[in-house]
């Protein structure tokens, strides 16, 4: 089945905005759940449907997932590094809604810290990483066709489409641009190659 209708959670974040733009340009009919619709771009590619709400509210998530064929999860906490359950709570609601609506494909972004030595996580990032771990466990136990995307440092370099994807956290570099990361999230919708895997996209930028 060719996926055409997708929901993006976290569409107003750094990677979310470029993923949203690339998805619309690629012809997807995109629904987004946002807390504040003013954070969506005022010009350029627009989502087909906007649900204003909170990923921690099951009813808001259910409304967003209804009628979709796949889901992209780019939840984050921005620059807030305090203890959080937003990403895991949101993911639990997304999984529940997907099962309720018969949607079985989800591509979700966490972090390469889940692939690397846990003792090497910088202390200031430990709380966010702990929630990424909870989020990943929910995906693993979901029974859905999930792709766990675990990027290294996310940069602002231009789109190349020439990144390397490995399954073990080792690659040509410890950076991926937000544009290439978005490109990879969308690529995962067109293949089953990475279903059930942890993936590490990276690229040696000039």
From Swiss-Prot:
**Residues recorded with modification Phosphoserine:** 42, 82
Enzyme Commission number, as recorded: 1.5.1.30, 1.3.1.-, 2.6.99.-
Highest taxon listed in the record's lineage: Eukaryota
| Short name of any one Pfam family annotated for the protein | NAD_binding_10
**Localization, UniProt:** Cytoplasm
Swiss-Prot/TrEMBL keywords: Cytoplasm, NADP, Oxidoreductase, Phosphoprotein, Transferase
Q: Which residues form the active site?
A: 109 (s-nitroso-cysteine intermediate), 188 (s-nitroso-cysteine intermediate)
Which GO cellular component terms are attached?
Answer: cytosol; nucleoplasm; plasma membrane
Keyword Manganese appears in the UniProt entry? no
Reaction it catalyzes: reduced riboflavin + NADP(+) = riboflavin + NADPH + 2 H(+); bilirubin IXbeta + NADP(+) = biliverdin IXbeta + NADPH + H(+); FMNH2 + NAD(+) = FMN + NADH + 2 H(+); FMNH2 + NADP(+) = FMN + NADPH + 2 H(+)
Picking any one GO biological process from the record gives: negative regulation of insulin receptor signaling pathway
* Inactivation phenotype: Adult mice do not show defects in biliverdin degradation or hematopoiesis. Impaired cytoprotective function in stress hematopoiesis, characterized by divergent erythroid megakaryocyte fates. Defective stress erythropoiesis is observed in spleens and in bone marrow erythroid development, in conjunction with defective lipid peroxidation. Mice on high-fat diet gain weight more slowly than wild-type mice and are protected from diabetes due to improved insulin sensitivity.
Known Gene3D superfamilies for this protein?
Answer: NAD(P)-binding Rossmann-like Domain (3.40.50.720)
Q: Which GO terms describe its molecular function?
A: biliverdin reductase [NAD(P)+] activity; FMN reductase (NADH) activity; FMN reductase (NADPH) activity; peptidyl-cysteine S-nitrosylase activity; riboflavin reductase (NADPH) activity
Chain sites annotated for binding NADP(+) = 10, 12-13, 15, 35, 38-39, 54-55, 75-76, 87, 109, 132, 153-154
Question: What is the role of the protein in this entry?
Answer: Enzyme that can both act as a NAD(P)H-dependent reductase and a S-nitroso-CoA-dependent nitrosyltransferase. Promotes fetal heme degradation during development. Also expressed in adult tissues, where it acts as a regulator of hematopoiesis, intermediary metabolism (glutaminolysis, glycolysis, TCA cycle and pentose phosphate pathway) and insulin signaling. Has a broad specificity oxidoreductase activity by catalyzing the NAD(P)H-dependent reduction of a variety of flavins, such as riboflavin, FAD or FMN, biliverdins, methemoglobin and PQQ (pyrroloquinoline quinone).
State the PANTHER family in the record: FLAVIN REDUCTASE (NADPH)
Q: Which family does it belong to?
A: Belongs to the BLVRB family.
Quaternary structure per UniProt?
Monomer.
What is the protein's name according to its record?
A: Flavin reductase (NADPH)
Q: Which organism is it from?
A: Mus musculus (Mouse)
- Per the record, the gene is Blvrb
């Amino acid at each position: 089945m060719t996926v055409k209708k997708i929901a993006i959670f976290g569409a107003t974040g750094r990677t979310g905005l470029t993923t949203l733009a690339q998805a619309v340009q690629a012809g997807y009919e995109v629904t987004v759940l946002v807390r504040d619709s003013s954070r969506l771009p005022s010009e350029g590619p627009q989502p087909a449907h906007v649900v204003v709400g909170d990923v921690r509210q099951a009813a808001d998530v259910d409304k967003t997932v209804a009628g979709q064929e796949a889901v992209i999860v780019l939840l984050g906490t921005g620059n807030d590094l305090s203890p959080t359950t937003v990403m895991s709570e949101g993911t639990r609601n997304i999984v529940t809604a997907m099962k309720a609506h018969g949607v079985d494909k989800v591509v979700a972004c966490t972090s390469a810290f889940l692939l690397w030595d846990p003792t090497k996580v910088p202390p200031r990032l430990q709380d966010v990483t702990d929630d990424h771990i909870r989020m990943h466990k929910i995906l693993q136990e979901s029974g859905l066709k999930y792709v766990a995307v675990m990027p290294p440092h996310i940069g602002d370099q231009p789109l190349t489409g020439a990144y390397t994807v490995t399954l073990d956290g080792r690659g040509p570099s410890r950076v991926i641009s937000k544009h290439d990361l978005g490109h990879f999230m969308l690529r995962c919708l067109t293949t089953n190659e990475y279903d059930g895997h942890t993936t590490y996209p990276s690229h040696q930028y000039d």
